From Swiss-Prot:
The keyword Metal-binding does not apply. Keywords: GTP-binding, Hydrolase, Membrane, Mitochondrion, Mitochondrion inner membrane, Nucleotide-binding, Protein biosynthesis. GO terms for biological process: positive regulation of translation; translation. One of its GO terms (cellular component) is mitochondrial matrix. It is a peripheral membrane protein. Its EC number is 3.6.5.-. It comes from Plasmodium vivax (strain Salvador I). This is Translation factor GUF1 homolog, mitochondrial. It is found in: Mitochondrion inner membrane.
Length: 910
């Protein structure tokens, strides 16, 4: 007896063979009430035939490597992932449905045997044999993915959720049902990109935790405090070091949150975050009020013209000064009282109302219709399996896997291997859309292939020729491509992302130079503090270089270049944003890469003016480079005033673009780019005196005093917030460090001082002194804008046994150079252990020694065995020992402790 299922199976195979032989073209799929599938397109060659629901339905999957298993599954129940292919005159049904009455189901419900299908039905063209372009656009195949209901009561079709006109509100993405395969469907008007900004210890990470909890981005069992602070150093120190991007779903909205650091050493992370956001949450500690970093953040937000949501945190504390802080915000920042939110991030109080404000106040990303793919890189890191991972913001278009892209700045081409979102772990997807913050992997293995602020465009739109690189303008295309997710059509004949591109008439022949397509550069801070890093063991020099390369990839403000020291061997001259930044880098090298390091004394960039006629040719060739331009450096006239020039450049000079260790924060270069320029009358801003200039952070590059006409040191605008009762202590400390008073502001019971301070004076322990004299209530921050002022500086040389230790040389002002030199000599005496020979430690300026200390040698009692005899025997032994000590003094080497520089210069992380 032949079973019914065998007959049905044979019938299915017969239908399949018959349909494959008559393969012609794909048509649209819809549901028809109470019946089955049919094709509504006219002229379908007999495809108006309807099939009863109790019939046998078969599923076809294209490109499958496991056809046998899927075939059996399709016969027995359902093939929910298959795509229906209708051919002229015949068609292949999609599902195998059982009799509703035999299954005991309600007649008004239609369910599948097997797992339930939750995705809409899609029909995709195959190998260019699709419908004409006009039919595929809008109401044709895959335009909206809309299905007519198939139930007797107008309900959803069997196994398919109700899908009513899911149009994408983002014309900039040209969204459609087929966007490359798997990107989540969401209107781009529902995307919100924002960051959380605040002074240190104001509760940014705690608020980010509440965001993750309330949006259910992280499961409760995996949740922990400071979840986004994934580095062990961040958890130990209780601070945020790196910006973190995370994607969250809130109702029908997509939140792209960027958690930023609060310490001013990592202010460059804040500036990069602002470049890719449309709004920001300004978080204020309810127990401390407005602090110094709050002022800098507010000014930076105004520069970027971002929407600001003021939020007062920690309202659950008894010491919260809510009314007082509100008054300060109204008077100082000119907020409206109704705009200020009160929350407790610890207990999630008021966070839901903050969500509503984010939705209503922060605008969605700018949308551009019919645009090609373009994105900007604002962060990156290294993965040992995938190589360099780029964190990008998509400015235009859609990006899918296996797409060829072009990097404008580096002029390199690569193929995208993986795209996805940060949730906060990497979650791959099929495509990313306009306005998204996502990651891409291009299988890059070299850390210097792509840099921060790089612009990525689709390779299809770049037309290369022998002389210049031009880009086809795609803003205007013939016809409306509303049904295409991203066709990427160019007049160069490049195929679309999905199938062959239909012929499209271009209404413009305008071509754009490639440089004009580059996005606005992300703010990247240049290092202001420099020091040398050496490995304790020479065998680890290569490992140290590899570690620095990977750290530079993850930290745009960090720079380094090779350097060699006679006493410490091969090393690297590195640039940082402050001593905390230096401390973090050193600790990460030790923990993540297992390399023990020695760090030299920190220094800053100095502008040196030398005598053009007096300097010899050899020294000129070593220091001078024509790439350096003094016009890019803001020099204060006469060493007074703030020296701020409207026309001075905010970027680095031409010579500092290589990321070398001696690059200044604003408009400088170093020994490699330490060039020269003559002061002239047409220099913008305050004109420096005429002469030969170069810039360096290496004190040993400064020649003898008879060659030098002047040394200029960097000054920065410093803001200090303190209670009124401590203001005299603050002013005394600032004047002691050669600060120039600018102005004072009063905010209720607090005072804000503005000083121009020498950068070298505030780097070492200045914040500790501020905290000490204000009993912990004071705070300090400084701007990255640098002004150079001429100062009476002296080069201090440290000698050990008549040998100059280059790594210990430093510059000091004439008011305190003797005090600093004597202090270093005394500390060296305490740190260096006694040797078999005499150790003499000296400090001097030029040929004049002004401080000296001696460490007596270890002596053996050579006369212990002399129990009598002539005195000449005893004297002979002592003279022989003394002669040996003198010989050892001339040829012996003093061992310096590896942690000498940290203790010597009191290098505490600010």
């Amino acid at each position: 007896m032949i079973h019914a299922w065998a007959i049905k199976r044979a019938l299915c195979i017969f239908i399949l063979i018959n349909c494959v032989l008559k393969l012609e073209r794909s048509l649209k799929v819809t549901w028809k009430s109470k019946r089955g599938f049919h094709t509504p397109v006219d002229g379908a060659n007999g495809c108006e035939r309807e099939w009863k629901r109790r019939g046998v339905f078969f599923s076809i999957r294209r490109g499958s490597n496991r056809k046998a298993a899927r075939l059996r599954k399709a016969f027995r129940g359902v093939g929910t992932g298959g795509r229906p292919l209708f051919r002229g005159g015949k068609f292949i049904p999609l599902f195998l449905l059982r009799d509703c009455q035999r299954s005991g189901l309600n007649e008004n419900q239609y369910k599948l045997t097997g797992r339930r299908c939750s995705s809409r039905l899609e029909v995709a063209p195959r190998r260019g044999n699709g419908l004409p372009f006009e039919r595929r656009s809008g109401g044709a195949i895959g335009a909206t993915g809309q299905l007519e209901d198939g139930g007797p009561d107008g309900g959803s079709p069997p196994g398919v959720q109700a899908n009513t006109s899911r149009r994408s509100h983002s014309s900039g993405c040209s969204s459609s049902g087929s966007d490359g395969g798997g990107a989540p469907e969401h209107p781009q008007q529902n995307v919100r990109n924002f960051c959380i900004l605040a002074h240190i210890d104001s509760g940014k990470s705690t608020l980010a935790d509440r965001f993750l909890e309330l949006t259910k981005t992280i499961k409760k069992k995996k949740m922990q405090d400071q979840f986004l602070d994934m580095m062990s150093l961040e958890r130990e120190k209780g601070i945020t070091i790196k910006l973190k991007a995370v994607r969250m779903n809130y109702q029908n909205y997509i939140f792209n949150l960027i958690d930023t650091p609060g310490h001013f050493d990592f202010y460059h992370e804040v500036k990069r975050s602002l470049s890719v956001c449309e709004g920001a949450i300004l978080l204020i500690d309810g127990s401390k009020g407005i602090q110094s970093q709050t002022l800098n953040i507010f000014l930076e937000l105004q520069k970027h013209n971002l929407k600001i949501i003021p939020v007062i945190n920690k309202i659950d504390l008894n010491v919260c000064r809510l009314d007082e802080i509100e008054t300060d915000l109204l008077s100082k920042f000119h907020f409206m009282k109704k705009d200020i939110l009160h929350i407790s991030a610890k207990y999630a109080q008021g966070v839901e109302s903050l969500f509503q404000r984010i939705v209503s106040d922060i605008p969605c990303p700018a949308i551009k219709s019919n645009a090609f793919f373009r994105a900007i890189v604002f962060d990156s890191f290294y993965d040992q399996y995938k190589g360099v991972i780029l964190i990008i913001k998509v400015l235009n278009g859609v990006l899918t896997k296996k797409t060829e892209v072009f990097f404008i700045q580096s002029e390199k081409t690569s193929i995208i291997q993986e795209v996805g979102y940060l949730t906060p772990d990497m979650k791959p997807t099929e495509s990313i859309r306009q306005g998204d913050i996502a990651y891409v992997s291009c299988n890059m293995r070299k850390c210097d292939d792509v840099q921060i602020s790089e612009t990525i465009v689709s390779r299809d739109i770049v037309k290369m020729n022998a002389h210049r690189k031009l880009v086809v303008d795609l803003d205007r295309l013939g016809g409306e491509r509303t049904g295409e997710a991203h066709t990427n059509v160019t007049r160069c004949g490049v195929e679309s992302l999905r199938g062959a591109a239909p012929p499209v008439e271009m209404h413009t022949e305008r071509e754009i130079h490639l440089e004009q397509m580059a996005a606005s550069k992300v703010d990247v801070s240049y290092p202001v503090v420099f020091c040398n890093i050496y490995s304790v063991s020479d065998k680890q020099a290569n490992e140290l270089e590899a570690a620095l390369n990977k750290l530079k990839l993850n930290d745009a403000s960090f720079s380094f270049k090779p350097d060699v020291c006679e006493t410490l061997g091969k090393g690297f001259k590195c640039g940082f944003n402050g001593l905390l930044h230096l401390n973090i880098i050193q600790e990460r090298i030790k923990r993540e890469y297992g390399v023990e390091t020695i760090v030299t004394a920190p220094s800053v960039n100095y502008l040196v003016r030398v005598k053009e006629r007096g300097i010899d040719k050899q020294l000129r060739e070593r220091l001078v480079d024509a790439r350096f331009d003094i016009a890019h450096v803001n020099v204060a006239a006469g060493g007074s005033g703030d020296g701020r020039a409207d026309g001075s450049a905010d970027g680095s000079a031409d010579g500092s673009a290589d990321g070398s260790g001696d690059s200044s924060a604003h408009g400088s270069s170093d020994r490699r780019g330490a060039g020269c320029a003559r002061g002239s009358d047409d220099i913008i801003g305050n004109n420096p005196p005429e002469g030969l200039y170069y810039m360096t952070s290496n004190v040993n590059d400064i020649p003898q005093k008879n060659y030098v006409q002047g040394i200029y040191e960097p000054y920065v605008r410093t803001s200090i917030v303190t209670p009124e009762e401590y203001q005299k202590h603050i002013m005394a400390e600032c004047f002691q460090r050669r600060g120039i008073f600018i102005k004072k502001e009063n905010i209720n019971s607090h005072v804000i001082f503005h000083f121009d301070m020498p950068l070298s004076e505030i780097l070492i322990n200045f914040l500790d002194q501020i905290k000490s004299c204000t009993k912990g209530y004071g705070s300090m921050s400084y701007e990255s804008y640098i002004t150079y002022r001429e100062s009476d500086l002296h080069k201090i040389n440290i000698y050990v046994n008549n040998r100059s230790i280059d790594s210990l040389s430093f510059l000091a002002h004439k008011l305190n150079y003797q005090e600093k030199g004597k202090r270093i000599v005394l500390k060296l005496k305490e740190m260096i252990k006694p040797h078999q020979f005499l150790v003499v430690i000296q400090a001097g300026v030029g040929t004049r020694i002004f401080a000296s200390e001696r460490i007596n040698p270890i002596r053996k009692n050579v006369t212990a065995k002399c129990y009598g005899g002539d005195i000449t025997r005893r004297r002979k032994l002592l003279e022989k020992q003394s002669a040996g000590k003198k010989k050892m003094f001339s040829i012996g080497k003093v061992k310096l402790p590896p942690n000498m520089f940290t203790k010597l210069f009191d290098l505490k992380a600010q």
